[in-house]
Amino acid sequence: KSYSSKLNIIKSKMNNNVRYKSEEIIRILLEEIFKEISFNRFMYVQGVLLRNLLNDVQLLTENERNFVNNRASLDFVIYYKQDKTCALVIEVDGFEFHENNPKQLQRDKMKNEILNKYKIPFLRLPTNGSGEKEKICIALNKLIDN
């Protein structure tokens, strides 16, 4: 019962005109999380071009450079409010779109490798998973504790 009431609360806050409902759910969770005092130092931007996070592309292979310059985007980028530096990237992986699509899995792998090269922390949230809010809070707490 409490599970369905939580879903109804989220559903009531959703914009039904969005392309991906899974990303809209994460957006709502981020809004809730950042209202908490311990996380109010963070802000997020949705749909950021990966290229915009990289100061330079020197570390990238030619394939990675092409990928980045071909409008590769990130679902959510969490920034520190104070200095606007990137704290965390969140990618929402829809099961149908990702698991059943070898090309998309390859793009996800390349994105992971690029984020790792530039030491940008990231969190992948599969839409067939659960406990997203807790996973996000754990990732943010790790940033605060470091």
Can you annotate each of these PLM segments?
Residues 1-146:
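Nucleic-acid endo/exonuclease domains
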